[in-house]
């Protein structure tokens, strides 16, 4: 049990969660219980709690106690209507999140959302694939929709009536207009607009199910607002019946003005209550590229465990901008360590002599390799050193709608050939497949393109690192497949929001990352049980095996070369990245800030102990075993850019494949030669002066395998 000064409203909002408090009765007798609370989310509604004392609910009135809306940063006192008899001594009081008064409304709304989404999918099938990028869409075309869906007007009318009834139910429950579910009335307006011109319905699916402001998605957003029961408890009073309570003023950290002070306070040395400010120069300094909630949680954990065990004081600061670290280093004002950096920053800093080579510490590979994938270190390697450690990781996996694939008679694809085979069925039903290539219109990063090269045995760099590898047959095969999936098989080129497309069913399957997983877990209750994840589709090899190489790195940690406390910094880094600390940190985050704060650790052992569904953990860990990262190089930016430009030119502008790849090769090789000359690998005549090692991580892994590790 962890002692928390006050509970944040977001930390305890999911059905079934409980908060426990110890309360002490000074003598036997009848006591009244009051709460100083803040409920800032449900305008015109209540958040509900069932109250237990010593494991039991003493009387019915303590079930589903409503805490009315207070406003943001505004507190009120609420006294339970009936007193409770308590014996002298300590008692355990529990508040369980519940929403029983709204369950009927919630279930009705869930049914409506699913019916609207199912109707949207059926309409797409009727309409067919005339909505892709290459199709000439006739928005003036009208449909005799009643011939295909005779009851569509009745459906629209029934949904409108049911949604209005749900709104009125919630109004009756709260005793006032439920402004927090005002989206329900916007949903009704959308449905009524569709009913006015039924022949245009297939061309206006954005009003029904396909857009973030559609009827289905507005109603689904309301589901979350009903389901979540945010409530902050500042303190609990145990008192006599007529006792006057203190006025419910906001606490010291409430209110806008004090909120600003608290924000500024997070940058001060006083943030570190464990530090001896008189010996500030002796403290280990750490900059973190994370929001304040993450920093504060780590600060507390460090004080409780690391400093207590080692005696090393640690000062934390929120990093204003990781791009400014170079400037800080030039003035000697950089910290000893940085956490939460973009995964490629350590190598970039190493090229400027700013980072410590972690291989200088004899045990680094032993403890790191035991709990992390050493391939994650590839973008942090430079020449013969490793200058950062992977901290958090993405997981790119295949997301799929079980309900839709079943209805189409499709199975989960294992290879890209399987994906190609399913595309005609998806197209016939006006659906598509997502790849990260479609999620960023302007730039295709290594994370989006690398999987296709690596699965085919290709690479961005030549074996010696002095040229691009675009002329290699394996690399060309990967590049061609990456292009033909769009040119020949019609994958959608532009899906700016895969989550919304997946939710509506217009893109019921695709490769995406941790962010999508989190959105589905916490923001799409209507899809519970309707979706799942699988391994990324792979490329079948000559021996029948399937390669599934894909990127996974997210953030990294590093030690600065001008630090005077390298040993202390390394000791902290080793503690911070250990499975025990990572798991404890993940738990503390969710305890303090709620289940939405899922820590995407890169530690395999820690992830295995986290609260992901068991089947999902198995998929994530297996996909991680295929992690393959693009090496960072003095000229890596040009290779990333040229592959991106080539894809855009070939797929969207129709340029010939080989001619455009040849152009990318020339541009890349010219820039590689210029950068390697700048860094002293080539002389002014282009002659090699020294080798460039691009195989360090492979060599380290091979050596460990030979040693039986």
Across the structure, where does each feature detected by a protein language model lie?
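Glycine-centered hinge/linker elements that transmit conformational signals in sensory
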Residues: 464-495, 536-539
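Extracytoplasmic
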Residues: 1-237
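Extracytoplasmic/periplasmic solute-binding protein
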Residues: 382-391, 396, 420-468, 474-475, ...
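Hinge/lid segment of periplasmic solute-binding proteins
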Residues: 261-280, 343-397, 420, 448, ...
């Amino acid at each position: 049990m962890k002692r928390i000064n006050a509970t944040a409203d977001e930390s305890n909002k999911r059905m079934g969660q409980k908060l426990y408090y110890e309360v002490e009765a000074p003598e036997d007798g009848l006591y009244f219980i009051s709460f100083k609370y803040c409920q800032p989310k449900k305008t015109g509604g209540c958040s509900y709690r069932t109250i237990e004392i010593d494991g039991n609910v003493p009387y019915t009135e303590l079930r589903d106690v409503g805490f009315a809306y207070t406003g943001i940063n505004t507190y009120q006192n609420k006294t339970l209507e009936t007193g409770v008899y308590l014996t002298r001594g300590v008692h355990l009081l529990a508040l369980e999140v519940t929403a029983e008064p709204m369950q009927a409304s919630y279930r009705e709304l869930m049914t409506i959302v699913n019916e609207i989404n199912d109707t949207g999918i059926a309409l797409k099938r009727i309409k067919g694939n005339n909505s892709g990028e290459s199709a000439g869409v006739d928005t003036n075309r009208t449909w005799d929709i009643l011939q295909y869906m005779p009851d569509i007007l009745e459906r629209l009318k029934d949904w409108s009536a049911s949604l209005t009834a749900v709104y009125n139910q919630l109004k009756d429950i709260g005793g006032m207009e439920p402004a927090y579910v005002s989206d329900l009335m916007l949903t009704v307006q959308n449905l009524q607009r569709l009913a006015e011109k039924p022949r245009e319905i297939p061309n206006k699916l954005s009003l029904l199910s396909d857009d973030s402001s559609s009827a289905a998605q507005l109603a689904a957003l309301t589901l979350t607002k009903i389901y979540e029961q945010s409530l902050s408890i500042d303190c609990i009073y145990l008192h006599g019946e007529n006792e006057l309570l203190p006025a419910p003023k906001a606490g010291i950290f409430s209110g806008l003005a004090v909120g600003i002070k608290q924000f500024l306070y997070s940058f001060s040395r006083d943030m570190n209550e464990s530090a001896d400010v008189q010996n500030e120069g002796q403290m280990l300094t750490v900059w973190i590229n994370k929001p304040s909630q993450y920093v504060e949680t780590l600060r507390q954990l460090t004080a409780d465990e690391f400093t207590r065990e080692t005696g090393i004081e640690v000062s934390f600061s929120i990093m204003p901008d990781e791009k400014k670290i170079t400037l800080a280093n030039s003035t000697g004002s950089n910290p000893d360590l940085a956490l939460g950096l973009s995964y490629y920053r350590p190598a970039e800093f190493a090229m400027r002599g700013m980072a410590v080579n972690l291989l200088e510490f004899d045990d680094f590979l032993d403890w790191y390799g035991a709990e992390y994938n050493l391939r994650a270190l590839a973008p942090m390697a430079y020449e013969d050193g490793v200058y950062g450690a992977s901290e958090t990781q993405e997981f790119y996996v295949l997301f799929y709608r079980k309900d839709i694939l079943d209805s189409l008679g499709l199975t989960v694809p294992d290879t890209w050939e399987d994906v190609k085979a399913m595309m005609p069925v998806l197209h016939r039903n006006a659906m598509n497949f997502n790849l990260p290539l479609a999620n960023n219109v302007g730039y295709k990063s290594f994370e989006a393109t690398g999987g296709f090269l690596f699965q085919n045995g290709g690479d961005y760099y030549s074996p010696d690192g002095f040229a691009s590898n675009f002329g290699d047959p394996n690399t060309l095969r990967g590049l061609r497949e990456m292009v033909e999936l769009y040119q020949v098989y019609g994958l959608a080129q532009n899906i700016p929001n895969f989550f919304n497309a997946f939710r509506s069913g217009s893109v019921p399957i695709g490769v995406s990352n941790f962010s999508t997983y989190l959105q589905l877990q916490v923001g799409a209750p209507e899809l519970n049980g309707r979706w799942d994840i699988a391994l990324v589709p792979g490329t079948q090899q000559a021996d029948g095996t399937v390669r599934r190489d894909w990127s996974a790195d997210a953030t990294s940690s590093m030690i600065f070369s001008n630090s005077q406390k390298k040993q202390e910094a390394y000791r902290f880094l080793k503690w911070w990245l250990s499975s025990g600390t990572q798991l404890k940190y993940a738990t503390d985050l969710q305890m303090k800030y709620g289940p939405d704060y899922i820590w995407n650790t890169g530690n395999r052992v820690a992830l295995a102990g986290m609260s992901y569904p068991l089947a999902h953990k198995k998929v994530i860990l297996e996909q991680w075993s295929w992690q393959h990262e693009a090496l960072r190089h003095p000229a890596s930016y040009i290779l990333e850019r040229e592959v991106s430009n080539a894809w855009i030119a070939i797929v969207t502008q129709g340029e010939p494949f080989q001619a455009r790849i040849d152009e990318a090769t020339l541009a890349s090789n010219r820039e590689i030669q210029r950068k390697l000359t700048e860094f002293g690998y080539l002389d002014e005549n282009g002659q090699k002066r020294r080798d460039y090692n691009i195989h360090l991580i492979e060599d380290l892994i091979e050596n460990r395998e030979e040693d039986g590790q």
